[in-house]
Amino acid sequence: MVRALIRRVLGRQENDQSTPQLELPPTDSRDRARSMVMGLQDEICAGLEALDGEGRFQEESWVRPEGGGGRSRVMREGRVFEQGGVNFSEVQGNELPPSILKQRPEAKGHPWFATGTSMVLHPRNPYIPTVHLNYRYFEAGPVWWFGGGADLTPYYPFLDDARHFHRTHQQACNSVHPNLHKVFKPWCDEYFYLKHRNETRGVGGIFYDYQDSRGTLYKGQDPTGAAAKVSSELGATPLSWEQLFSLGQANGRAFLPSYAPIVEKRHATSYGDRERDFQLYRRGRYVEFNLVWDRGTIFGLQTNGRTESILMSLPPLVRWEYGYTAEAGSREALLTDLFTTPQDWLGDPSLEERCRPHQAIN
């Protein structure tokens, strides 16, 4: 009876908007989504402990008074990872925050549920990139969607690392639908962009949000951007709840294969004060993005999430330098000139010519 009522209400809404009807999620959608992201947290933590060799995650469980809770796992002072965290959360409530209602006003007035896993790793060695991922699921009455992504933030440029990370996630996306990576790659470049610096946070990866069973893939905020253009050219790409569930699972499981080979290749590279200082300086961009632009941070703070877990993404050490300019022709200059602007990492052969003089190929 309840599901029939939802269908009638939803049908009226969709008919008014002249858009396809939203598929209802499975009756066990919340349990399955919760199990999926908890499983990803377990798999990733086990893989990272093996990769580090010495560091171990310390777990802290927490309860949200308004409903829900989670478990935060943090590694400090490992052999490879200076600090890293892998979170799981499941939260629910009756009043949605403004950041959600602005995007999906039809969710207003419905009790809501959200679950997800998020991770940020800050390696010690400047030649190993910082990495981030987040996969999540949201429901509010008849409204539901999946979101997620992963992105790589190098401090020293290596074309092979960027290509490997992108290729691995492209394969994961293609296992669900061939259109996905074509939109989610430029969407990632768009999302992880520091407008006040006019640069991307790193070399990107994939990003997607508000994915339900309707319409075109791009549901972002720049209707004239590259992701919107590709999405419009591809047209409607209807995906079922099951396909979108598989998308999060496939990309979550692609994380270790996308990142572990980079760590194994770079962790023994020697470095000095110059490289460490540049790493700490570039970490400042990470802090700026997360505190100024990141919607996940904003959502967590607006919904009385656990502050320690929300800000777990910040690096343990960071520095700012007024008016810094990289030395012309240096690897630091290549990083800031090439690796902080959107590139066709998998399809542009000219990148090799730009990287080769700086030993940034292998």
Swiss-Prot record:
Q: Where is this region: Important for dimerization?
A: 286-321
Q: Which Pfam families match?
A: Coprogen_oxidas (PF01218)
Enzyme Commission no: 1.3.3.3
Site label Important for dimerization, positions = 196
List where in the cell it is found.
Cytoplasm
> What InterPro entries does the record tag this protein with?
Coprogen_oxidase_aer, Coprogen_oxidase_aer_sf, Coprogen_oxidase_CS
> What does the record give as the active site?
132
Cofactor entry? a divalent metal cation
Provide the primary localization: cytoplasm
Q: Pathway, according to UniProt? A: Porphyrin-containing compound metabolism; protoporphyrin-IX biosynthesis; protoporphyrinogen-IX from coproporphyrinogen-III (O2 route): step 1/1
Which GO BP terms sit in this record? chlorophyll biosynthetic process; protoporphyrinogen IX biosynthetic process
Q: Where does a divalent metal cation bind?
A: 122, 132, 166, 196
Q: Which Gene3D superfamilies match?
A: Coproporphyrinogen III oxidase, aerobic
Reactions catalysed according to its record: coproporphyrinogen III + O2 + 2 H(+) = protoporphyrinogen IX + 2 CO2 + 2 H2O
Q: Which UniProt keywords apply?
A: Chlorophyll biosynthesis, Cytoplasm, Heme biosynthesis, Metal-binding, Oxidoreductase, Porphyrin biosynthesis
Q: Output the Gene Ontology cellular-component terms.
A: cytoplasm
GO molecular function terms attached to this record: coproporphyrinogen oxidase activity; metal ion binding; protein homodimerization activity
Q: Which PROSITE patterns match?
A: COPROGEN_OXIDASE
Residues annotated as binding substrate are: 118, 134-136
Q: What class of enzyme is it?
A: oxidoreductase
Ranges for the region named Disordered are 12-31
The UniProt family comment states: Belongs to the aerobic coproporphyrinogen-III oxidase family.
Q: What quaternary structure, including any partners, is listed in this protein's UniProt entry?
A: Homodimer.
Protein role: Involved in the heme and chlorophyll biosynthesis. Catalyzes the aerobic oxidative decarboxylation of propionate groups of rings A and B of coproporphyrinogen-III to yield the vinyl groups in protoporphyrinogen-IX.
* Official protein name in the record: Oxygen-dependent coproporphyrinogen-III oxidase
Gene symbol? Answer: hemF
